[in-house]
């Protein structure tokens, strides 16, 4: 029988499993990622987030449709049958009263509200005497119940025709008739039927007008070995657990249609990646970085904590951390002119930094240093996540495998070398992954907020049962990693090296 793997046809026996089909297609996937199978389409009826409010006026029946943006607004609308239009002005229409004694809410005064917004107001501060208000123009509203609102999406012209006394007869959900794609999660050992379409990954085409945000997405993928972990899922979007990133610019603000990928550029969720499942209007806090070209159905069935394979077009073009020979091969692969500055073997910086800008300019300038000037380190991100994030931020390694440290002081006779940190950020570092009995030579650590010199970064040059890499006692020390290669080079440094730049390159592997 014939099935399809990521769009490609594959012939397999009748009793074949998902695993058999993947092997026949030459496709391998990690055991911990989610896979789906698309079975076809079916006609369905489903409720939407909109409610139809029916009003009676004489022999005529009027209909208004409100898109509900909060569950409590649905509960308010359920109380409307029997209520009447109590007043109309050139600015607003009020229906009620309605009893909302069972709802939790807060009230504010003088809140600016757009036209044709449905809100709840509490003019007497008595929840049994609340009113459902529809605005006709932008206006400041008094005694508004915050976070209980909706939008009039149909029947706006009728709002202006209401004169008072019209009665709400009933409220009903708006039902959509749609064609629904039948998709289900599967395991590698599940059986298949003829025509099944196996989806193993999501393919994203990057937008050329969001190079910085796209690089953040590419870095997140690279650090997670091509997999993204689902953080949150709603009917509107699926969000991805991000790598930390700061100071994202506003770029390529556009419509958030189904399949659009965005990165939040501000706020507490800065850096979070979103894939939209339903259309939404543009918002300045979201940069559109790409569009799902294949595999959107997989994101319709994932759950929080799932991992999905993701590929991008184009893939990341990052030279930092490569040898000069590797950099030349990469430049040739993508038809990019390579300009090498400096004497050495290891690329420690590149300009432009962003993949999309490199491909746009078809030229990249890289800075190289001798390999023996680059210290290789392993970071313990799982054991000390906040401290490792701090280290990457200080060294500018949030999106690159190579960073820079400046020597603060080097005393071989004291058994440590200390590098400059960021005192302001360091004061926010809580104790985590403190040493227990001893600190071995090569251990990398930072001073936490328990000590005056919070934020200093250090490497232990010899074992100690008393002091950490920055010379602090164990309660003031957060262990963040170890030196894998180059400890001898650090031992050669002394006070004449104060202020010198030391390059560090992260290697990932088993401890």
Swiss-Prot record:
SUPFAM superfamilies: Cyclophilin-like, Penicillin-binding protein 2x (pbp-2x), c-terminal domain. InterPro entries: Cyclophilin-like_dom_sf, Methan_mark_3, PASTA_dom. Pfam families: PASTA. Belongs to the UPF0288 family. This is UPF0288 protein MK0796. It comes from Methanopyrus kandleri (strain AV19 / DSM 6324 / JCM 9639 / NBRC 100938).
């Amino acid at each position: 029988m014939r099935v399809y793997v990521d769009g490609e046809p594959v012939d397999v026996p009748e009793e074949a499993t998902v695993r058999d089909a993947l092997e026949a297609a030459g496709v391998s996937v990690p055991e911990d990622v989610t896979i789906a199978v698309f079975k076809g389409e079916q006609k369905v009826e489903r409720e939407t987030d909109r409610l139809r409010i029916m009003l009676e006026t004489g022999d005529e029946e009027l209909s208004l449709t409100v898109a509900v943006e909060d569950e409590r607004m649905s509960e308010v609308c359920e109380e409307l049958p029997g209520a009447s239009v109590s007043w109309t002005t050139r600015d607003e229409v009020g229906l009620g009263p309605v009893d909302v004694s069972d709802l939790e809410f807060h009230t504010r005064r003088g809140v600016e509200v757009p036209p044709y917004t449905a809100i709840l107001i509490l003019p007497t501060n008595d929840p049994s005497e609340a009113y459902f208000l529809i605005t006709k123009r932008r206006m400041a509203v008094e005694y508004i119940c915050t976070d209980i609102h909706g939008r009039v999406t149909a029947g706006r012209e009728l709002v202006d025709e209401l004169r008072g006394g019209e009665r709400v007869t009933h409220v009903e959900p708006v039902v959509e008739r749609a064609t629904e794609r039948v998709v289900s999660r599967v395991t590698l050992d599940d059986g298949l039927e003829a025509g099944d379409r196996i989806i193993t990954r999501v393919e994203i085409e990057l937008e050329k007008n969001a190079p910085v945000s796209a690089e953040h997405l590419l870095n997140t993928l690279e650090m997670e070995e091509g997999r993204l972990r689902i953080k949150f899922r709603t009917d509107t979007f699926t969000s991805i657990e991000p790598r930390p990133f700061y100071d994202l610019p506003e770029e390529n603000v556009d419509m958030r249609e189904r399949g659009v990928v965005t990165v939040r550029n501000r706020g507490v969720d800065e850096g979070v990646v979103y894939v939209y499942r339903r259309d939404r209007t543009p918002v300045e806090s979201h940069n559109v970085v790409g569009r799902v070209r294949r595999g959107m159905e997989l994101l319709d069935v994932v759950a929080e904590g799932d991992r999905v394979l993701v590929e991008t077009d184009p893939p990341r073009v990052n030279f930092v951390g490569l040898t000069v020979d590797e950099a030349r091969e990469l430049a040739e692969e993508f038809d990019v002119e390579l300009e090498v500055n400096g004497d050495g073997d290891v690329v420690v910086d590149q300009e432009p930094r962003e993949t999309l800008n490199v491909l746009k300019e078809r030229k990249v300038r890289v800075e190289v240093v001798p390999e023996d000037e680059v210290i290789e380190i392993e970071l313990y991100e799982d054991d000390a996540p906040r401290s490792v994030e701090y280290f990457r931020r200080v060294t500018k390694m949030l999106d690159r495998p190579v960073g820079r440290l400046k020597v603060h002081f080097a005393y071989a006779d004291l058994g440590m070398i200390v590098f400059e940190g960021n005192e302001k950020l360091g004061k926010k570092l809580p104790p985590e992954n403190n040493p227990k009995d001893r600190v071995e030579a090569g251990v990398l650590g930072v001073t936490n907020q328990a000590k005056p010199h919070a934020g200093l970064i250090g490497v232990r040059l010899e074992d100690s049962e008393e002091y950490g890499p920055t010379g602090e006692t164990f309660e003031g020390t957060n262990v963040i990693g170890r030196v894998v290669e180059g400890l001898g080079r650090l031992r050669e440094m002394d006070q004449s090296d104060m202020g010198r730049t030391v390059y560090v390159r992260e290697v990932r592997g088993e401890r």
